[in-house]
Regions:
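Alpha/beta-hydrolase superfamily serine-hydrolase fold, recognizing
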Residues: 1-226
């Protein structure tokens, strides 16, 4: 997460440990941050991590027939976009990345920042793509529909909550995937006695009952597509 501008993998250490306790080998990655780089350097970084997993998985005991990707907020955006790019030669060419050799079975998208074209202000777009961002070759692909139409997006588990400031992004993606006939599951948490109505709750507070339920539901979705 972090809007492509801050945070590091250590922030998700506790969340990753909760996935590991449920029997998964978890690989957390860092990616380059704006404004030190411009988008889509982050896409290249994540694709490189997929390639590393494919090339080194056997040495670490990974089951490469059961690979899943999850991300929250900006990480959710990268999980969605890179999982799509991973299936499309046209998008690989656009983003300047090579084949990863990894078959991603399903993705978990937690409070994702999906529509960067319409859901992000011009100041952030300038940070991501430069001041002339509207003329960037990547600008048309900052909304999910363009990516979906050019790829075979894996089955997606989407979770948000009623007071998530990016709620509309997940809601719109659910509607778009439904319209496109893409397999997915959508969980929209409503108000509860705890904090499950906020942004990235299952990642930030993984031991809340609602968070544990969300994690278990996401992993059950993964298993159903393994």
């Amino acid at each position: 997460g972090g809007g492509l501008m801050y945070a590091e993998k250590e922030v998700n250490r506790v969340y990753a440990s909760r996935l590991a306790k449920r029997g998964y080998i978890v690989v957390c990655i860092n990616y380059s941050l704006c404004p030190d780089v411009t988008y889509p350097t982050q896409v290249s970084d994540v694709m490189a991590s997929y390639r590393w997993v494919a090339e080194n998985g056997e040495n670490f005991g990974f089951d490469l027939d059961r690979v899943f990707v999850a991300g929250d907020s900006a990480g959710g955006q990268l999980a969605f976009y890179t999982a799509a790019v991973n299936t499309s030669d046209e998008l690989k060419s656009l983003y300047g990345v090579s084949d990863t050799g990894l078959n991603i079975k399903a993705i978990g998208l937690i409070s994702g920042m999906f529509d960067m074209k319409n859901g992000v202000n011009s100041a952030l777009l300038s940070c991501y793509l430069g001041y002339d961002y509207k003329n960037s070759p990547y600008y048309p692909y900052l909304q999910p529909e363009e990516i979906i139409d050019k790829s075979d997006i894996p089955p997606a588990y989407i979770v948000t909550s009623v007071k998530d400031f990016l709620h509309s992004a997940s809601d719109d993606l659910d509607k778009l995937l439904t319209e496109k006939g893409k397999e997915h599951m959508y969980h929209d948490w409503q108000l509860t006695v705890n904090r499950s109505s906020g942004h990235i709750t299952s990642v930030a507070y993984p031991d809340l009952p609602e968070s544990a339920e969300t994690i278990d539901e996401m992993l059950a979705f993964f298993e159903a597509h393994s």
